[in-house]
A protein has these predicted regions:
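Short, glycine-biased loop/turn motifs at secondary-structure junctions and
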Residues: 1-223
Length: 223
């Protein structure tokens, strides 16, 4: 029976998630247990996307993560609120993916124009970055993560899911740590945020769902 480490290495065509594969080795060949035990939210959402969990469910989960962090960071700007509004409208069928994409470009353009002169606090800027990654998930939404989907497109889409969660964890770490924190304090806050996100993701997507998606895609068990 293949192991979870082998599954992640198989899905990780770019070699960017080697540490994740090593960390997952402790779970042996139990995918459901791995889903329950992994404490890094970015890795969880990437794995769910990579094995083929329903793409719109990935987006809904990501949107809820962004919404929760947005409510915690009082300096988060209007550009993030507009992205959330656009994605929620898209989920209701009231906006097109192109309109969501434009809201992301608007947010990105605002950040880029301000550059180093940005009045946004670091945590608010990281939330805005996460919002841009969320719009890319909508823009590049695949009909399904089937074996026929171009590998390049699949890598980008799953990577966007990982990046969005990573930006949110960076935002919370910045928000909860002073400008010049003691050694290790910001990293601790980052890891704590990732653990929190892992819990929230598991509230949306359960381990058996991930296992079934992987089996249907032919990614698990590996031949």
């Amino acid at each position: 029976m293949p192991t979870i480490r082998q599954l992640i290495e198989h899905l990780d065509v770019t070699g960017e998630y080697c540490q994740f594969a090593l960390d997952a080795e402790q779970f042996g060949d139990d995918l459901v247990q791995a889903w329950t035990g992994i404490e890094n939210g970015a890795h969880l959402l990437w794995l769910a996307a990579a094995v083929g969990v329903e793409p719109k469910k990935i987006i809904a989960t990501a949107c809820d993560l962004l919404g929760e962090v947005f409510e915690q960071i009082e300096t988060a700007g209007q550009e993030t609120a507009q992205v959330l509004e656009a994605v929620h409208a898209w989920q209701r069928g009231e906006r097109s993916a192109d309109e969501v994409d434009r809201s992301g470009w608007d947010a990105y353009g605002l950040i880029a124009r301000m550059g180093d002169r940005s009045p946004l606090a670091p945590d608010a800027e990281e939330v805005a970055d996460a919002a841009v990654w969320l719009t890319s998930l909508v823009r590049d939404l695949p009909p399904s993560l089937s074996p026929d989907l171009a590998e390049h497109d699949q890598v980008l889409w799953c990577g966007s899911a990982w990046m969005m969660v990573d930006c949110l964890a960076q935002a919370l770490a910045s928000h909860q740590s002073p400008d010049d924190p003691p050694p290790g304090e910001r990293q601790h806050a980052f890891e704590k945020a990732m653990c929190r996100f892992a819990i929230l993701i598991r509230e949306h997507i359960v381990g058996t769902e991930v296992q079934t998606a992987a089996q249907q895609r032919g990614a698990w068990p590996l031949c």
